[in-house]
Amino acid sequence: MACVAALFASSALLPFPSTASSVASASSCGCRVRSTVVARAPRHQRAHRGLRRLDEVEGVSKKRRGIGGGGGSGGSQASSSRRDRGLAVDFKEPQVADFDDLEEDKFLNAVVKVYCTHIAPDYGLPWQKQRQHSSSGSAFMIGDGKLLTNAHCVEHDTQVKVKRRGDDKKYIAKVLARGTECDLALLSVENEEFWKGSEPLQFGRLPCLQDSVTVVGYPLGGDTISVTKGVVSRIEVTPYAHGTSDLLGIQIDAAINPGNSGGPAFNEQGECIGVAFQVYRSDEAENIGYVIPTTVVSHFLNDYKKNGKYTGFPCLGVLLQKLENPALRESLKVPSSEGVLVRRVEPTAPASTVLRKGDVIVSFDGISVGCEATVPFRSTERIAFRYLTSQKYAGDIAQLGIIRDGNSMKVQTVLQPRKHLVPFHVEGGQPSYLIVAGLVFTPLTEPFIEEECEDTLGLKLLAKARYSLATFEGEQIVIVSQVLAHEVNIGYEHMGNQQVMKLNGTAIKNIHHLAHLVDTCKDKFLTFEFEDDFLVVLDREEANAASSDILKEHAIPSVRSSGLSEPYVDPAEEIQKTSEDFGESPVTNFEMGIDCLLWA
């Protein structure tokens, strides 16, 4: 069935972009969805307007949040012993000598089709989930009984099935790890019959510019395997639309369409050089697709092998300014045209103990950092400084060469993944909530913002979501999303999307802390102080008595999410406050809107 949809046309990168929506009839880009949906791209993805996950290229998403996928299936004729290869990326001999006769090469049979059933959380009604829907995507065999695909292909999965090329039987698959930042997911299939005669793919090295590349998958337009060819156009640190992170990416001009997401990209030797995952769409550009390179794939697989789970890509947690201006360098006593200026350090980052505002970072693990925040890459290229931190693992130590007040020195810091005050993905899949006398409290998250639409939140809350930093471990912005009308909350029933600041004079740290304060309160009244000095006072005993009626009226199973029943542990003995509320959020570099400022 043909897919007719309006494309997001603008390519501008805006900090507060305008909204857009479209309707598609049969397929999404990257996953093939089985129902008609109204789409609205997530706010953090609309910030770099043209960049889309494959499932969002034609505007189809799962009601409020995109779902992923590409196409693929596989059936193979090679030795089953190949299944037991390790997960490590192998850069040795090519799997085939000639790539010209692609249809005859057995490695095509390592590409499988993924069928996923999704049930996404309902962030507006956090005690329930959205309607179930299905999509299809791609994956491929990498050895040791494992499959690799995109994380957005299996987001919010309840059931995952895979089918090999030339076979009509589907097998149940299990999601072992899901890397939201790098948009990768690891699957396993326990049924030995699925692996009979399987031939896993071999990974190749990072390609060079103008190298030929072939993308394999099952895009819309047919049911059999599809092959498209092109060349490598660019290799650089790229914004990942699903993960909202900046990692190494390969730009190609081969057609990547709905159905290719999660499928492999091959070089001329038949080695897999990456995973297709997103495209760039605008009125002024065409044939711009992106592939996750094997360096990122290797990091993801090694992370899982080392820790038994995905722990993420670490960073320094600093806001850097380029030092191109000679007068600026002279004022900082930087003798050469190198180094980047530290303008801000995240309070929760380990680097906050060794770096401070005004330091100039001139080297990272002995590698010189240029004044444009770039470092040497391969023989004659340069790449963004962020590339060096992304090669590390959580808990690794980095040695920094810095200039402080004109003096050169060496410092060491531990690298950890960034923790957003307003997270882009909800861990565990289900949002937390607390209901007090009909007031529904929940942490502010990007999925909630997408679902509610920016217009209903107010500029102040949106500014906090985008520009505020967490000042201590575990901090959240807690809001009242709505009020379930009852006589106990008369006068407050029209509240919605307002941040709660204090309860009975105590500053609220997170949703769990709020639940703890409510549970331990002995006062006659519950006094909530909201932003803009709005006050809500409830009789504590009346509020408790009204709970059962409110739950029954709205068919809600509990006054709180399951995690809030656990004993509360204070996230920090001492809360380090910052004097600046805005302008220091760990948003992506493209969202900063200022070319000379970037996070690393």
Tell what function each PLM region has:
Residues Q130-R131, S138, A254-G259, G263-P264, ...:
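PDZ/PDZ-like domain segments forming the peptide/carboxylate-binding groove
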Residues V114, L125-Q128, E190-P200, S226-E286, ...:
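Active-site region of chymotrypsin-like
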Residues M1-A41:
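N-terminal chloroplast transit peptides
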Residues Q95-D100, P121-D144, N150, K170-I172, ...:
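A conserved glycine-rich beta-strand in the N-terminal activation segment of trypsin-fold
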Residues A120, G143-I225, G249, P258, ...:
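Conserved active-site neighborhood of the chymotrypsin/trypsin-like protease fold
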Residues A110-V111, Y115, K146-A151, L206-P219, ...:
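Active-site-proximal beta-strands of protease catalytic cores
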Residues D98-E104, V114, P219-D223, C272-S336, ...:
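C-terminal cap/linker of serine protease catalytic domains
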Residues C153-H156, P350-S352, S363-G401, K502-D532:
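PDZ domains, with a preference for the canonical peptide-binding region formed by the helix
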